[in-house]
């Protein structure tokens, strides 16, 4: 009888030791639900860049500019994911400022003084986005890294993006920040909102309100009307709330460092 009891105790101890952290399975399932949103947004960016290539071939500068702007939306919504999971592709696709390739190299050609000959850069951008979309079918969407991505992007929107904008030549820096904020809201809602609400309803309400404030800060008609100080404060508050929430849902506090797990 004692042997059975000791065996049972040992089995119970091992089960507790080897089991996933509380909330790990629901978070993993929520991250999987987010995958399709990423595929859709990167697919939209890819479709936009293919339209851009068609307009360049037709020597349609106005159409090419419009396609470039449209392609940015899906990309910017996905930045919760891109820099932390695929940093090399992120640099090929969206390095800034003063990039000679990717979105911003093409921006300099279309909206700057270099004319319409951006076909080589556009071919490369199509290839990189197609590569990324293919990888999205199987890449491991670790919830910790996605939480890091939300915190990092929120901090960036309130920091260097607010300090002058990312897409200055095209005049669409505000569009970038709006899409970033929408991407943050989407990722938080799909992946983390339910888990935080279960762990701490009061904290969940505060985090959701902080996400909404970030979106409201950039839903303005013109970048000149941006209250940069308020945006910075609101972005930092959101990061702080995410850091408070993380251990309550079985994760480490999110880090702002690139390449963190």
What are these regions (language model features)?
Residues 1-9:
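Bacterial N-terminal signal peptides that target proteins for export
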Residues 8-19:
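Bacterial N-terminal signal peptides
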Residues 25-261:
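Mature extracytoplasmic or organellar-lumen-exposed domains after removal of signal/transit peptides
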